[in-house]
């Protein structure tokens, strides 16, 4: 079975928006052996969308469109589908009721908003739990809003429906092992000899949250993947921070709540400017653990808020092991994280170059400070400092709960 993806939106062609939807779609369809035949970007122009649909229906079994489902004049994807199929656009009365509930929270909808719940006559709608416009499916064509969070909310619902309708079964098994603290090339050199089990494809994918070792095979070879995963843990366990949909912040949260009493945590951040705290509080329920974040960017704030000694700052400088250690002393929770560094582009010296970061970790009475020299632009250095802080905390917590 083959599928084609159309990304609808002039903003995708002029660089105003970056596509991430097609990656997600391809990965999900791949699990059922559905091949992506093509991916195309189409402007918000009726003739171009209908022309694209004509091409697609001759070449693939499933046509997926994202974008153009909103209430404005240039949102014409469903209108183009209806025109191509020679069907009327009708209001989905069930979805209209849902839309009214959503708008009631802050304003009443006007007539243009009801455009979001229109569909080609006979189409099936899929409820949008995080936005306004539902996805619609008819005659081998499905349209989703362009917002990634809305697509990810509805795509599993559609896929479940489509799989059942076409009597498909999962053909591909995918296992992701998430690593951090080891470079992609070193990782490959370290583990590539382990991939000897038959008919298993492997690749290394660099993400913001780590480097993935992706193992892919036919569903009947699932046991062979399990054997490789076991070997990976035996060889590189110190760098493994999770599997599949695991994320480091969720794993840390689990570690904080393994005992009879939840552990509390706070952060004192300079160069990361609250990024460590922000990542942690993405986890639902962490309010029982997370107490505060102090962004002490200036020396004055470090002295006043965290009781860092003026003498320490004068002798060693703000970017130093000693200051990272004293920043932790100002945190009164079970666990503390401190960051201080030079994110650039300016401010570096020969002794303290741009990218130099000190990360302090306090767990109960044990304190460790890690020195890192990170590469990249300002945002990359800050992102990597945040991830290194969480990675080092996880490694310490993992040892304590074993």
UniProtKB/Swiss-Prot annotation:
<dbReference type="InterPro" id="IPR008136">
    <property type="entry name" value="CinA_C"/>
</dbReference>
<dbReference type="InterPro" id="IPR036425">
    <property type="entry name" value="MoaB/Mog-like_dom_sf"/>
</dbReference>
<dbReference type="InterPro" id="IPR036653">
    <property type="entry name" value="CinA-like_C"/>
</dbReference>
<dbReference type="Pfam" id="PF00994">
    <property type="entry name" value="MoCF_biosynth"/>
</dbReference>
<comment type="similarity">
    <text>Belongs to the CinA family.</text>
</comment>
<dbReference type="InterPro" id="IPR008135">
    <property type="entry name" value="Competence-induced_CinA"/>
</dbReference>
<dbReference type="InterPro" id="IPR050101">
    <property type="entry name" value="CinA"/>
</dbReference>
<dbReference type="InterPro" id="IPR001453">
    <property type="entry name" value="MoaB/Mog_dom"/>
</dbReference>
<dbReference type="Pfam" id="PF02464">
    <property type="entry name" value="CinA"/>
</dbReference>
<protein>
    <recommendedName>
        <fullName>CinA-like protein</fullName>
    </recommendedName>
</protein>
């Amino acid at each position: 079975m083959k599928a084609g993806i159309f990304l609808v939106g002039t903003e995708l062609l002029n660089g105003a928006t970056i596509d991430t939807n097609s990656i997600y779609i391809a990965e999900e369809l791949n699990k059922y052996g559905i091949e992506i035949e093509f991916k195309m970007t189409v402007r918000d122009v009726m003739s171009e969308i209908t022309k694209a649909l004509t091409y697609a229906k001759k070449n693939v079994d499933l046509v997926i469109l994202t974008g153009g489902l909103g209430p404005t004049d240039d949102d014409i994807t469903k209108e183009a589908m209806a025109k191509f199929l020679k069907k009327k656009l009708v209001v989905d009365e069930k979805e209209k009721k849902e839309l009214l509930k959503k708008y009631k929270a802050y304003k009443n909808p006007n007539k243009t908003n009801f455009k979001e719940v229109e569909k080609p006559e006979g189409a099936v709608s899929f409820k949008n739990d995080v936005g306004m416009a539902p996805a619609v499916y008819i005659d081998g064509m499905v349209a989703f809003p362009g917002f990634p969070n809305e697509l990810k909310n509805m795509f599993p619902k559609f896929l479940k429906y489509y799989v059942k309708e076409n009597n498909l079964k999962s053909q591909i098994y995918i296992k992701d092992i998430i690593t951090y603290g080891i470079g992609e090339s070193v990782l490959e050199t370290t583990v590539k000899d382990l991939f000897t089990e038959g008919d298993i494809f492997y690749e290394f994918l660099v993400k913001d949250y780590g480097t993935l070792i992706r193992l892919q095979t036919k569903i009947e070879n699932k046991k062979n993947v399990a054997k490789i995963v076991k070997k990976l843990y035996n060889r590189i366990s110190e760098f493994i921070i999770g599997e599949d949909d695991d994320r480091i912040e969720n794993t840390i949260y689990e570690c904080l709540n393994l005992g009879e009493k939840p552990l509390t945590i706070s952060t004192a951040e300079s160069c990361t400017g609250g990024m460590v705290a922000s990542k942690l509080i993405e986890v639902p329920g962490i309010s029982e653990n997370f107490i505060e974040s102090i962004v002490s960017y200036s020396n004055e704030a470090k002295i006043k808020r965290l009781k860092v000694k003026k003498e320490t700052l004068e002798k060693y400088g703000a970017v130093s092991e000693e200051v990272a250690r004293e920043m932790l002393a100002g945190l009164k929770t079970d666990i503390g994280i401190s960051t201080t560094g030079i994110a650039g582009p300016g401010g570096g010296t020969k002794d303290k170059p741009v990218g130099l970061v000190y990360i302090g970790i306090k767990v109960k009475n044990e304190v460790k400070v890690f020195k890192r020299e990170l590469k990249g632009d300002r945002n990359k250095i800050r992102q990597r400092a945040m991830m290194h802080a969480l990675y080092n905390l996880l490694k310490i917590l993992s040892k304590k709960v074993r």
